[in-house]
Amino acid sequence: AGCDRATEPRPREEQPVRHTIAYLKSLCDGAESRLVTREITVRGFITANDRYGEFYKSIVLEDETGGITVAVDQTGTAAEFPFGYVATLHGAGLRLCAYGGKVGIGIGAGEQGAEGIPAEETGRYLTVEPPGEERHTARTVTIDGIGPGLVDTRVRIDGVRFVESGATWCDTDPETGRTVTTERTIVDEQGNTLAVRTLGSCSYAKEPLPEGRGSLYGVVDCFSGKYSLRVTNRDLLFP
């Protein structure tokens, strides 16, 4: 089963042209990729970028119906797409891609999902504005409550500890000395576990994991039915 099963009725023609992220993702249902051939506009909060190196050449947008990863072929996304700002995505001409069961969007389809929108073209597809009175609030969830509807949304998980006490966020390749993308494991008081995936490019990759029980904020990821959490904006609440 795929990680995304967005089902939403097709909007009537007299409705505004703005659509939901769940509707946009539903257009790819059952297909490896699908070109967006008509003007579909979605609006959502930016919940992930590369401010701490946590997301590479991608941002995550989220509205009240779900979230989606937008592939962009540029670094420094934190400056152009600040965390918590509101972005409007114009979908016409972009391609939805399902990779590992998760639907994302970009300029084309590659071997590992959507290919990044070229830096010189991002202004054509994405516009960004300050949030104003609006504020994104992460949904508080439990590990055993994570399911398809939470993929690419930012959540808060309380009362968890890292299994690998004393380890760093990422392992280091002994040959190159570089940190590598690593999965650690959190466990809650009921014994439920969840992988926490951190990119080797993350600015705190070499720092030790927090000790004790606390809370993590992150975007829910999914690949081939396996869920993980990717910390965003370095939001941690530990003693």
Give names to the regions the model predicted.
Residues 3-239:
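OB-fold nucleic-acid-binding modules
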